[in-house]
UniProtKB/Swiss-Prot annotation:
Annotated Gene Ontology cellular component terms: cytosol
GO molecular function: ATP binding; glucose-1-phosphate adenylyltransferase activity
Cleavable signal peptide: none
Functional description taken from the UniProt entry: Involved in the biosynthesis of ADP-glucose building block required in the biosynthesis of maltose-1-phosphate (M1P) and in the elongation reactions to produce linear alpha-1,4-glucans. Catalyzes the reaction between ATP and alpha-D-glucose 1-phosphate (G1P) to produce pyrophosphate and ADP-Glc.
Annotated metabolic or biological route of this protein: Glycan biosynthesis; glycogen biosynthesis; Capsule biogenesis; capsule polysaccharide biosynthesis
BP-aspect Gene Ontology terms: capsule polysaccharide biosynthetic process; glucan biosynthetic process; glycogen biosynthetic process
Native source species: Mycobacterium tuberculosis (strain ATCC 25618 / H37Rv)
Top-level division of the source organism's lineage: Bacteria
Uppermost EC category: transferase
Remaining remarks: Maltose-1-phosphate (M1P) is generated by two alternative routes: the TreS-Pep2 branch and the GlgC-GlgM branch, however it seems that TreS-Pep2 branch provides most of M1P for the GlgE pathway in M.tuberculosis.
Binding, alpha-D-glucose 1-phosphate: 99, 164, 179-180, 197
Catalysis performed (reactions): alpha-D-glucose 1-phosphate + ATP + H(+) = ADP-alpha-D-glucose + diphosphate
Protein name (database record): Glucose-1-phosphate adenylyltransferase
Length: 404
């Protein structure tokens, strides 16, 4: 029987998420609600907890209050067994300064690693939508003998220019790691696809500590995990790529196996929601064998009255649809859609109300928005452009607490 390694999870959750504005005006990107019942951070935490990695530090910085509260209310583990998920803001142990990058966040938090003394460290991002069994990646890392392993997802070469791209040999060793190249490299077995980094890493502990310390002494570094630490280890011949398509998650369907989305823009965030709503969704939220855990509020069930209906939609607990039509949309908890209103192809966050006879199309409404009776959002983009953010793809985004 193989010895069970001691693994510490570090989740990088300090992202500001400027491209998701106005959704990040009052919260960190990992705290943005998603999918009717979750926050973005719930996906990485669910993956780690499902794999029984139960000692997790979440490094936070930007407008972290709602993120900290969400973790403390919904992610309590058994302290008696030494299990924890703890938010860790910048401690300023090394002087009065904030994190200057993801690698610097770990450098300033090295005490967490020394205290836990793990064999391996899982360093994952906090703002992607996916299912993954990290234990399989840890086993790959151990068997490969690498000091660092980068999770790579296959994308068509022509679509890879916006990502950090990985060039690996037949054994999986990374030969080069390049951010946003004009000519992305092919994979060893398919020249038409490219491995792009998912922002998920496994490190042997000493390798990470040595690399982080060396990076901290480099005045020319941006102190970024993907931009500085990984290239440093690639140059030393110590990095391998883990093919995400090899990851087998219990209960996965053929459609959502190897699903992963970077939701860093309004259009990507919107599109990922539309992946949830069909009868056979591109990403299935209802996999009981690998559950995504989210809000644990005690709410009444959703209710449909006076002929109200929802088709190809996700409707959260506590919501009421009254003589209204909801189609191809995701509604979070405590949403009210009043008589005669129409909601189509939209994402509605908790506590929002769509008034009598109002129309909302191709839009994202943040928490506690009120759309007045007869008002329209997403119908006249020129009018909307004067008062709301509109994405490159024409998605109208309305900020938190706005009355229309």
């Amino acid at each position: 029987m193989r010895e069970v390694p001691h693994v510490l999870g570090i989740v990088l959750a300090g992202g500001e998420g400027k491209r998701l504005y106005p959704l990040t005006a009052d919260r960190a990107k990992p705290a943005v609600p998603f999918g009717g019942a979750y926050r973005l951070i719930d996906f990485v935490l669910s993956n780690l907890v499902n794999a029984r990695y139960l000692r997790i530090c979440v490094l936070t910085q930007y407008k972290s209050h709602s993120l900290d509260r969400h973790i403390s209310q919904n992610w309590r583990l058994s302290g008696l067994a030494g299990e924890y998920i703890t938010p860790v803001p910048a401690q300023q142990r090394l002087g009065p300064r904030w994190y200057t990058g993801s690698a610097d966040a770990i450098y300033q938090s090295l005490n967490l690693i020394y205290d836990e003394d793990p064999d391996y460290i899982v360093v994952f991002g906090a703002d992607h939508v996916y299912r993954m069994d990290p234990e399989q990646m840890v086993r790959f890392h151990i068997d490969s003998g690498a000091g660092a392993t980068v999770a790579g997802i296959r994308v068509p070469r022509e679509n890879a220019t916006a990502f950090g791209c990985i060039d690996a040999d037949d054994s999986g060793r990374i030969r080069s790691f390049v951010e946003k190249p004009l000519e992305p490299p092919g994979t060893p077995d398919d020249p038409d696809t490219t491995f792009v980094s998912m922002g998920n890493y496994i490190f042997t502990t000493k390798v990470l500590i040595d690399a982080i310390r060396a990076d901290a002494d480099d005045d020319h570094s941006d102190h970024d995990m993907g931009g500085d630490i990984v290239p440093r280890l690639v140059a030393d011949g110590m990095a391998a790529v883990y093919d995400f398509s090899d990851n087998e998650v219990p209960g996965a369907t053929d459609r959502d196996r190897a699903y992963w989305r970077d939701v860093g823009t309004l259009d990507a965030f919107y599109d990922a929601h539309m992946d949830l709503v069909s009868v056979h969704p591109v990403f299935n939220l209802y996999n009981k064998r690998w559950p995504i855990r989210g809000e644990s509020e005690n709410l009444a069930p959703a209710k449909f009255v006076n002929g109200g209906s929802a088709q190809e939609s996700v409707v959260g607990a506590g919501s009421i649809i009254s003589a209204a039509s909801v189609r191809n949309s995701v509604l979070s908890s405590n949403v009210v859609v009043d008589d005669g209103a129409i909601v189509e192809g939209s994402v509605i966050m908790p506590g929002t109300r769509v008034g009598r006879g109002a129309v909302v199309r191709h839009a994202i409404l943040d928490k506690n928005v009120v759309v007045g009776p007869g008002e329209m959002v997403g119908v006249d983009l020129e009018k909307d452009r004067e008062r709301f953010a509109i994405s490159a793809g024409g998605v109208v985004a309305v900020g938190k607490g706005v009355w229309i």
